[in-house]
UniProtKB/Swiss-Prot annotation:
Keyword Lipid biosynthesis: yes
Gene: plsX
Membrane-traversing stretches: none
Lineage top rank: taxon: Bacteria
Protein name as catalogued: Phosphate acyltransferase
Species this chain originates from: Thiobacillus denitrificans (strain ATCC 25259 / T1)
Length: 339
């Protein structure tokens, strides 16, 4: 198996090199087929490497970039005015073929705009989508779009379904993964005209289309893939994150209420730790910008080292399993059938 090279936007995210550099070092130690290009100000990267008793080598290359995209910077300004940013240079490395994938915890809008401008979309794909994994009672489900496209057509949702199914099939080695369309009800008569039309297209496609699913079906694990527009997807994501935090806060408060509940908390501690591990959002960090001519993975901006490692591993898995080719092949098949 050939080696995989991942370009890392060192300066992206809330914690920048204090997270991205040590996470890269740990991933290199765990994955012998992985090479890393750290992109950012050379002096900052060198200092962080020294702090972790590491340095450049055959599998760890430093590429200087003089600019940084701020987390609140307008995507258009980042695209036009920051051509030597760590984010832009990392994406350029994918475009040139020096890297197989790019990982960034930076500004989502700037990352999507820059990646789309530099890499372009795959043939037959109108718009890239953000695909992220969400926990379920039986494992996890892939949900897309998570916010890249607020307004979608039925054809866009069909393309999202194809891309999501191919990603799950390739990375998780699931034959014929099931695809659900997020709606306000399971019945065919439910939803707006765009969603109804999307259901028809998905049903007529070669995909294993389950039908309409509701929000609670995501967490029940009813389907392997859940398709929706970016507005609905982002609201779903933020609501689920808020719910998880609320449950954690309420549980802590209840167990600290009096001495009896504190004792109960100590008894339940092993179960609570297992519960926390299973729902730990760090385990699911790394949303893929699907539909581009290159693998680009977006880490959560507040990710710690453990979470950022998962984002790097997500990028590596997609390259190893040739996700881009699978998506391209399926889109071409759809176009031949339509013709």
């Amino acid at each position: 198996m050939r080696n995989i090279t991942v370009a890392i936007d060192v300066m992206g995210g809330d914690h920048g090199p204090h997270v991205t550099v040590p996470a890269a070092i740990r991933c290199l130690a765990r994955h012998p087929d992985l090479n890393v290009i750290l992109v950012g100000p050379q002096d900052i990267i060198a200092a962080e490497l020294r702090a972790h008793r590491s340095g450049p080598g055959p599998r760890l290359i430093v590429r200087h970039a003089s600019q940084v995209v701020a987390m609140d910077e307008a995507p258009a300004l980042a695209l036009r005015g920051k051509k030597d940013s760590s984010m832009r240079v990392a994406i350029d490395l994918v475009k040139s073929g020096e890297a197989d994938a790019c990982v960034s915890a930076g500004n989502t809008g700037a990352l999507m705009a820059t990646a789309r401008f530099v890499l372009k979309t795959l043939p037959g794909i109108d718009r890239p989508a953000i695909a992220a994994v969400m926990p379920t009672v039986s494992g996890h489900a892939l949900v897309l779009d998570m916010g890249a496209n607020v307004d979608c057509t039925a054809e866009h949702l069909l393309q999202f379904g194809i891309m999501g199914a191919m990603l799950v099939s390739a990375v998780e080695h699931k034959q014929n993964p099931s695809v659900g369309l997020l709606n306000v009800g399971e019945e065919d008569i439910k939803g707006n005209e765009m969603v109804k039309r999307a259901a028809e297209l998905l049903r007529d496609s070669h995909l294993n289309f389950y039908g309409n699913v509701e929000g609670n079906d995501i967490f029940k694990g009813t389907t392997d893939v859940v398709v929706c527009d970016g507005f609905v997807g982002n609201v779903t994501l933020k609501a689920s994150e808020g719910l998880a935090k609320m449950i954690s806060t309420v549980l802590k408060a209840e167990f600290k209420r009096n001495w009896l509940t504190r004792i109960a908390g100590l008894i339940a501690l092993p179960v609570l730790k297992a519960f926390k591990r299973r729902l730990d959002p760090r385990r699911y960090n790394g949303a893929t910008l699907l539909g581009l001519k290159g693998v680009v993975v977006k880490s959560h901006g507040s990710a710690d080292r453990y979470a950022f490692e998962h984002a790097i591993e997500t990028a590596g898995d997609e390259v190893r399993n040739n996700v881009l080719k699978r998506i391209t092949d399926q889109i071409q098949l759809l176009q031949r059938v339509a013709a």
